[in-house]
Amino acid sequence: MDAHGVLQFLLFLALVLALTPILGRFMTWLFQAPVGRVEDGFYRLLGIDPTREQGWAAYAVSLLIFHLLAVFGLYALQRFQGMLPLNPAGQGAVPPDLAFNTAISFATNTNWQNYGGESTMSHLTQMAGLTVHNFLSAAAGIAVAVALMRGFARHSTRTVGNFYVDITRVTLGLLLPLCLVGALVLVGQGVPQNFDAPVTVTTLEGVSQVIAQGPVASQMMIKHLGTNGGGFFNANAAHPYENPNALVNLIHMLAIFAIGAALTNTFGRMAGDRRQGWALLGAMAALFLAGLGAAWWAEAQGNPVLGGIANMEGKEVRLGVAASMLFAVVTTVTSCGAVNAMHDSLLPLAGMIPMVNMLLGEVVVGGVGSGLYGMVVFALLTVFIAGLMVGRTPEYLGKKIEAREIKLAVIAILATPVAVLGIGGLAITLPMGQAGIAAAGPHGLSEVLYAFASAGNNNGSAFGGLSGNTIFYNATMAAAMMIGRFVVMIPVLAIAGALAAKMAVPASAGTFPTHGWLFVVLLVGIVLVVGGLTYFPVLVLGPVVEHLALSAGILF
């Protein structure tokens, strides 16, 4: 790790820590402010009563209906894009199975892409379909997190908020203003924003090349701020139009972390104790630092088959190894999934770290909203285990944690392993799944594991060697994405409803403090143990075996 790489990391960390309380304070105000005149007029236009709050079940039904309509709308737009305007490249209809996979992918905040954006989607589909869903899926995740915060903040009530009010406030009051400013900065740095057709140019080698362009900047900002990750171009953030220089690369990474980190501060403020938010952020930071250090060290060792020289395969020279590895860890500890280097080209142990980041449940900052409520679910499990050790009924933020909450937490925690290992196991064993695996041996297993870890945890990044655009993978990965999204969200909302109905319990001498270092250590341990016990065998069979084979000079 050189001084330049350390400086990049320290600058990134300092900016994230500086933004966290500022954005956290603003979001606290946004979610608690009374309805204004302009806002009330907007609700009247849509037929929404902002004073009518919902119980957790009604909130969940609204969430599911909203996503169902979103999937149908995006599917239809893809199927009919050939007959619609803003299609200068003349893109035809997207095949049914690919359109279904893409609609599920963007509606669930996954943004897994079994296609090349510039060669498949029209400008209209990119803007009115994919970009719009980047806003809405991110807003839905934040809304669920806010509902959970209200569960802790309220007592003796059956309501957790109004889904339509929450998603409107997040979209109009938070995401749109930040994206407008951010997109203008990106345009100033050379990111295109136009409606032009692809241009044909003659390269330095004297051959012709078609260069796509379009409304890139507007999609790039929400792609990162909403931890969506789907690229306008097939190369994603490795493409110079998406990520032209080091400054834009830094802006992208800050946008990925900004809301997820700040929501911990909002959580502490709404719970009445800011230390609780810092404790959660501390646990996230510990896991992030460990992953970053391990990934950097593993990639810096170089390829042993080539005498240990630096591994520049799949990386952009303008960014280098340090910025590529920092981005790889940032994008996988969150549910973003954007990439500025090809993860399939990382050395085995370095490639394992992004995989592990996802397999831990995307709770290290995680997706906007989903990272917070995922870590809170682990916090509930932590205080439950701590309570068992001392023989007391566990409490968290003044609420007794009982059997119902723990059962719901376990359902939420087990949802993604079922999707990853269950459906991924089918892909490994069935001929339809094996047909898409390009690499032999342990790396082929890693490609499939990475794909379903990405889909099940709503990340969207990939080991590019897997041929995913088949009916089998389009269907199975869509199923994994839905399980990873909704079978986690619904139990979280049920937990919010159960907590909101409870009376607040004053802290006593026997209450386990959840704002100190001991709680942070226990929380990190629970996250690692659950992830390690669940996925350790398959990780050994994949990247660990590949590393040992590579060290012995065996290639696959």
From Swiss-Prot:
Family to which the UniProt record says this protein belongs: Belongs to the KdpA family.
Organism in which the protein naturally occurs: Paramagnetospirillum magneticum (strain ATCC 700264 / AMB-1) (Magnetospirillum magneticum)
Transmembrane segments: 3-23, 57-77, 129-149, 172-192, 247-267, 278-298, 319-339, 346-366, 371-391, 408-428, 486-506, 516-536
Any coiled-coil regions, as ranges: none
GO cellular component: plasma membrane
Keyword Signal: no
Protein name: Potassium-transporting ATPase potassium-binding subunit
Pfam families in alphabetical order: KdpA (PF03814)
Keywords per UniProt: Cell inner membrane, Cell membrane, Ion transport, Membrane, Potassium, Potassium transport, Transmembrane, Transmembrane helix, Transport
